[in-house]
Amino acid sequence: MHVSTSSVPVAIGRLTLLAFGFALAGCQSLSKVKEPVAEPTPAPPVIQSPLATHQFQFDAATDAVVGELQVTKVEGEDTFSDIARRFNLGYEELVRANPGIDPWLPGEGREVVLPTQYVLPNAPHEGLVINLAQLRVFYFPKVAEGEPTTVITHPIGIGKVGWSTPEGSTKVVSKTKNPTWFPPASVRKEHREAGDPLPSKVPPGPDNPLGTHMMTLGWPSYLIHGTNKPYGVGMRSSHGCIRFYPEDIAQLYDDIPIGTKITVVNQPLVLGWHRDAMYLQAFPVLEDDQREHPSGADAVLKAGISDEMWQRVKAHSAQVDLQLVNHLVDKPLGIAVPVSRRGVTVDKFLYASRHVENRLPEGANWNGKEELLVSEEQFEAARSGVILPKPEAPKKAVKAPVKKAPAAAPTAKTAQVAKPPPVEKSFDVERATPVKKVTGGSAQPAGQR
């Protein structure tokens, strides 16, 4: 076949144009494939009423998690201490759950996580169960046969480093309203050396660190009591005793009979089943806890999951997210998170939680009234276990003597009836104010606080 040489350039040109057209079409197709599909903007969460999270009923045969996670927004000049008390949380609970936020200046409008969902400690559901790592107490009152299990939970303050609260079992030995405090020699020595000497006896009243209610334990020198410094609850601030908010100890006082069993554990990692998933709640290891704790997901699951819980995981065709477990253990937020539910991340779980108004929940123990204003210096001293020296009493002002002008010669007007010299009045506060004796209080055995 003969092809004219003059037609070759024309054919080549046509082929080139055709190829160029295909190339353009291909680029357009490629660009369409590469375009990311914009995810729909999630709807803003519905703001609901806050929940009071201190008393729950649950089925102990199937559940080991109570409460519900909540998120609120900072209002006005709120600090973490204000928000914590409002929602029956401890200060450290809020700090852990909200890393990177200034607890004194969180910023108006900023979202704050309220860790108001709790995995119950691995201990018998009987009497008072205290988890030191959790800085929280769980009270299981006796219920009639066939009724659901009830648990009451509150934040607590525990012994600071060097004055740690012991672990083990004991019981309530006695109860006292409006107790008198006799500071033990060790505590008086510590305060004296810090420039804050204590009296040998502190009567009931606003200056009494035991607060208005006290329970003595089978352990000598250790107490459960209220406090005159509520901001110290939810942290390591005591000399080994267990501190409650005033409103919380007042509620529990009448409900807890003498002889109630007390179990104190120290569990930084707690696992529990709730509905369709296994939850993990991780807390920082206490500074003076020298034990070796599991650090990897495999070790955590091996140490914390019972055969019964494994059977539940299998029954729900669930799979534990090892990456999520490692994340929670490495960065313990103190938030109960489901680790056997597909597609869960901490951020997604927080977003899906209950967003609430920043106000006192219905049914809360606290009445919302502050008893004591505290400075940041006082607060941080309590948190770090430092005793501030007692402030010096203001010195009395001494008036400089005034030189009197020489007396003028009496005149007809002044030479009348002489007035008596003015009498200087003195006011003895101690004598002028009647002292009211307080009865009904009693001393505790060489207790700390």
How does the language model describe each region?
Residues 23-26:
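C-terminal motif of bacterial Sec signal peptides marking the signal peptidase cleavage site
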Residues 77, 107-112, 259-262:
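Loop/turn positions that initiate beta-strands
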Residues 76, 92-100, 110-126, 152-159, ...:
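N-terminal post-signal-peptidase region of extra-cytosolic proteins
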